[in-house]
């Protein structure tokens, strides 16, 4: 099982390439999958984690409209990616557009995946002023600190 953690600020070059932080490279592997993520970011999965996630999507009932829409969101946006010898990967133009990425991005390790955010969206979505309320709702889900 993969274990990504940490926060890294990077830039996308003129060709749409991003340097993957060295801490993530070995865990991510040479080939991986990038797709649309929730909250306007991108999700990056190592191949084995993607296969596990994809397997869970396959179990959703086809007759359920929300299940079809949820699966379509992740599967239609998915792109196989590779890392070059310099640790760079190309972020497909459609995914850059979805995540409103221009130049500055933030990569975050989220245990089983990496999230890539435009710097602006990261700041907008991740103010921690409501952390007490979030912690209370996590306790309702069975997670307590």
Pin down the residues of each PLM region.
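Flexible "stalk/tail and boundary" regions
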Residues: 1-10, 14, 24-81, 85, ...
């Amino acid at each position: 099982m993969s274990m990504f953690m940490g926060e890294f600020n990077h830039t996308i070059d003129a060709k749409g390439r991003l340097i993957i932080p060295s801490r993530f490279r070995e865990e991510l592997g040479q080939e991986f999958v990038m797709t649309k993520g929730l909250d306007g970011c991108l999700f990056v999965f190592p191949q084995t984690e993607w296969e596990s996630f994809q397997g869970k999507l396959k179990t959703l009932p086809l007759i359920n409209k929300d299940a079809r829409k949820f699966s379509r969101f992740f599967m239609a946006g998915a792109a196989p990616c590779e890392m070059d010898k310099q640790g760079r990967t190309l972020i497909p133009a459609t995914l850059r557009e979805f995540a409103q990425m221009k130049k500055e991005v933030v990569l975050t390790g989220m245990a089983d995946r990496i999230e890539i955010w435009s710097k602006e969206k990261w700041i907008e979505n991740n103010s921690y002023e409501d952390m007490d309320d979030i912690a209370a709702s996590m306790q309702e889900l069975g997670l307590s600190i």
